[in-house]
Amino acid sequence: MTTIRGDDLSNQITQISGSSSKKEEEKKKQQMLTGVLGLQPTMANHPVLGVFLPKYAKQNGGNVDKTAFRLDLIRMLALHRLNTKTGSD
């Protein structure tokens, strides 16, 4: 029988809980993307969504104003587009 030191055991617990929390975070992001924002999962690769989706998912407390999130996303997409157009001129 192998003895597991306390440090090893706590590292194993951290790895297990870390992977489950990552799965929960991904699930929240997908739910926010499709349920609240009404977007296709393929849009998750957009640079603006890559930045704001984790923030949106953390703010999502269940009872949210979908319109407010959508308007904020449209504003961010417009700013991104404006910055990329002026940067290339």
UniProtKB/Swiss-Prot annotation:
Alphabetized InterPro entries for the sequence: HV_small_capsid (IPR031385)
Domain of life per record: Viruses
Keyword terms: Capsid protein, Host nucleus, Virion
Intrachain disulfide bonds: none
Main location: virion
GO biological process: viral process
GO-annotated cellular components: host cell nucleus; viral capsid
Subcellular location: Virion; Host nucleus
Comp. bias (Polar residues): 9-18
Stretches the record annotates as Disordered: 1-31
The family this protein is said to belong to: Belongs to the herpesviridae small capsomere-interacting protein family.
Quaternary structure (record): Interacts with the major capsid protein/MCP.
Primary role: Participates in the assembly of the infectious particles by decorating the outer surface of the capsid shell and thus forming a layer between the capsid and the tegument. Complexes composed of the major capsid protein and small capsomere-interacting protein/SCP assemble together in the host cytoplasm and are translocated to the nucleus, where they accumulate and participate in capsid assembly.
Protein's recorded name: Small capsomere-interacting protein
Lineage of producing organism: Viruses, Duplodnaviria, Heunggongvirae, Peploviricota, Herviviricetes
